[in-house]
């Protein structure tokens, strides 16, 4: 690594000290093989355009076939628009047939499909060699390179085959750390420290796939081949395994780099999945990127490049709710933008509710609303009174409850602006609604996002209804369904006259709060509360994450502007109970 870095540095120093003009950027062939990728191409192509690399030093090699969507049209239109920017364009479309003879579905990888893709990749490799290209960049059409310096950074590693580690919603990534004697994936303890970036660098691995750079200037690269398989190859017919075996037989080591965040890609759907499943999975990838402080702006810029031209018109709706309320502080415009876009991508419409800014409330405001804190209330973690942020949060939800009652809204969805959606969120929410309606569940409130506090016993499941439980003591009001009857019950409790945080008030109202003294102030506690299980939304950030901001806990005490909360986040018991935002899922 030191030697490679020194070599690259010496080249840079030589260029800087030389009075002659600088060297041209290396010649790159970008090989793209797309099938049924209309849903991902606008973002993928936008990310390619945004790479900080001279376009006139890049040749595009693009193939597409066996499509049942408008992938061909999108690629053709894009190539026509950008062809003068790039050095060369090779375009290989094939309209028919729309399916392989031996595949039961579009997501099934049959032998004919594997062989076809390998032949296309080999054709791209041979074209790159004929053009005397310095590098071949292979990229799948749903891989989003949000780091604009990716190409330069990979080149600087001076490796024959090197991949940028791609992020996903699970532990899955575009490399293997282990391979069995038959060429299949093997779990190893080395994988997760690399995947989580607990160890950073460029690591020798037996397999990289999806997006990687091949240095054609290396002599050993002449022995690399995607097709046909090496004469000694006896493993399964799989394009990535065949190429990894070719690299092994050529004594070429594959590397994966995780020094930075380079980009994102979706977790592959199962072979029996539909194209719609894949579309929704990719939408979730977009939402995950928008939830990351590192990727949000890059994705926002690229998305608009093609959206208005090539994507079908999006018709947001309320999916059966009378209203969808999204709470947002006016000064948190970044959150508002992200949430509106996230909802739009899922074809969901909402009413933006301006949150009550607790910091802007003064003593006169509080007295005019006749607000009084619940006698004896202290935060269970910090032994402090209510904060102004918590007061503002409560009033924001309270105002929505009033609107639901005033408008007579039978069913509403209430969400906050700091949540991230689980994969297939819309479909799962619709299924939940259908189940509740079908079995005539008598409900007032259904959490779709929360922090369950009573973890020492299981919550009671609801007979005949999948994925719903009776809610026990819970924190957070990230998202919940509320009925008209539920809103009326909450208002009848007159909570402003005995105020406590909203996520403490709700468990009181469904008679599950562990502090009996609090419940004693509310005579009627008959709110019928349930929860989706598993949950449908989670926080965008957990305490301690980079980019974490709390508008409720880090503020002054509600009735004393001079008294700030001496809250040490690192020592917080709540922090310890929340834990970190760990990778969910498995490697595959």
Model-derived features with residue positions:
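Conserved donor NDP-sugar-binding/catalytic core segment of glycosyltransferases
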Residues: 129-130, 143-184, 427, 432-457
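An acidic/histidine-cluster motif and surrounding catalytic segment
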Residues: 167, 211, 231-235, 241, ...
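Catalytic phosphate/metal-binding cores of nucleic-acid and nucleotide-processing enzymes, i.e., regions
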Residues: 35-37, 42-44, 74, 78-79, ...
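Short beta-strand-to-loop acidic/aromatic patch adjacent to the donor-nucleotide binding site
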Residues: 132-146, 410-420
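A conserved hydrophobic helix/loop-capping motif in glycosyltransferases and polysaccharide synthases
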Residues: 28-37, 44, 51, 63-65, ...
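Active-site-proximal specificity loops/subdomain of glycosyltransferases
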Residues: 70-134, 348-409
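Short, acidic, metal-binding catalytic loop of nucleotide-sugar glycosyltransferases
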Residues: 22-23, 46-57, 67, 77-82, ...
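Short, flexible, basic/aromatic active-site loop/helix in glycosyltransferases
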Residues: 164-168, 179-205, 211-221, 453-473, ...
């Amino acid at each position: 690594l030191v030697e490679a870095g020194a070599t690259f540095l010496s080249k840079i120093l030589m260029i800087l000290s030389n009075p002659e003009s600088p060297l041209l950027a290396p010649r790159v062939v970008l090989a793209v093989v797309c099938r049924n990728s209309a849903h991902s191409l606008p973002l993928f192509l936008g990310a390619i355009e945004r790479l900080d690399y001279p376009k006139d030093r890049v040749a595009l090699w693009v193939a597409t076939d066996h499509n049942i969507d408008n992938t061909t049209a999108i690629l053709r239109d894009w190539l026509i628009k950008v062809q003068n920017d790039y050095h060369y364009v090779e375009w290989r479309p094939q309209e028919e047939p729309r399916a392989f003879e031996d595949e039961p579905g579009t997501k099934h990888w049959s032998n004919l499909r594997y062989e076809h893709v390998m032949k296309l990749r080999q054709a791209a490799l041979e074209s790159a060699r004929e053009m005397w290209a310095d590098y071949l960049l292979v990229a799948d059409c749903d891989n989003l390179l949000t780091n604009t310096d990716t190409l330069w950074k990979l080149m600087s590693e001076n490796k024959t085959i090197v991949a940028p580690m791609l992020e996903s919603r699970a532990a899955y990534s575009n490399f293997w750390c282990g391979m069995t004697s038959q060429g299949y994936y093997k779990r190893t303890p080395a994988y997760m420290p690399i995947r989580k970036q607990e160890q950073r660098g460029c690591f020798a691995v037996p397999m990289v796939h999806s997006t990687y750079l091949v240095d054609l200037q290396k002599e050993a690269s002449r022995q690399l081949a995607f097709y046909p398989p090496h004469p000694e190859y006896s493993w399964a017919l799989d394009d990535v395994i065949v190429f990894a075996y070719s690299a092994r037989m050529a004594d070429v080591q594959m590397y994966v780099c995780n020094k930075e965040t380079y980009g994102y890609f979706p977790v592959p759907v199962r072979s029996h999945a539909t194209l719609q499943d894949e579309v929704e999975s990719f939408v979730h990838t977009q939402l995950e990127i928008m939830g990351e402080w590192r990727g949000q702006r890059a994705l926002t810029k690229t998305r608009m490049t093609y959206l208005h031209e090539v994507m079908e018109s999006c018709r947001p709706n309320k999916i059966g709710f009378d209203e969808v309320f999204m709470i947002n502080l006016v000064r948190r415009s970044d959150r508002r933008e992200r949430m509106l876009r996230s909802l739009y991508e899922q074809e969901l419409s909402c009413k933006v509710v301006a949150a009550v800014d607790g910091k802007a409330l003064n003593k006169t405001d509080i007295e005019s609303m006749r607000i009084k804190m619940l006698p004896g209330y202290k935060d269970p973690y910090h032994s402090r009174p209510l904060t102004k942020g918590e007061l503002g949060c409560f009033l924001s939800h309270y105002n929505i409850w009033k609107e639901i009652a005033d408008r007579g809204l039978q069913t509403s969805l209430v969400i906050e602006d700091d949540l991230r959606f689980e994969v297939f969120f819309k479909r799962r929410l619709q299924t939940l609604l259908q189940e509740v309606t079908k079995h005539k569940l008598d409900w007032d409130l259904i959490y779709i996002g929360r922090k369950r506090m009573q973890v020492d016993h299981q919550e009671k499941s609801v007979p005949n209804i999948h994925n719903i439980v009776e809610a026990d003591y819970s924190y957070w009001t990230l998202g919940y369904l509320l009925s008209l009857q539920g809103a009326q019950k909450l208002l009848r409790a007159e909570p402003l006259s005995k105020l406590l945080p909203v996520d403490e008030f709700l468990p009181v109202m469904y008679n599950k709060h562990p502090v009996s003294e609090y419940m004693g102030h509310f005579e009627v506690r008959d709110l019928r509360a349930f929860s989706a299980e598993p949950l449908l939304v989670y926080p965008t950030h957990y305490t301690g994450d980079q980019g974490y901001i709390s508008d409720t806990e880090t503020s002054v005490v509600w009735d004393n502007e001079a008294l700030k909360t001496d809250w040490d986040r690192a020592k917080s018991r709540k922090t310890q109970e929340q834990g970190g935002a760990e990778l969910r899922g498995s490697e595959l």
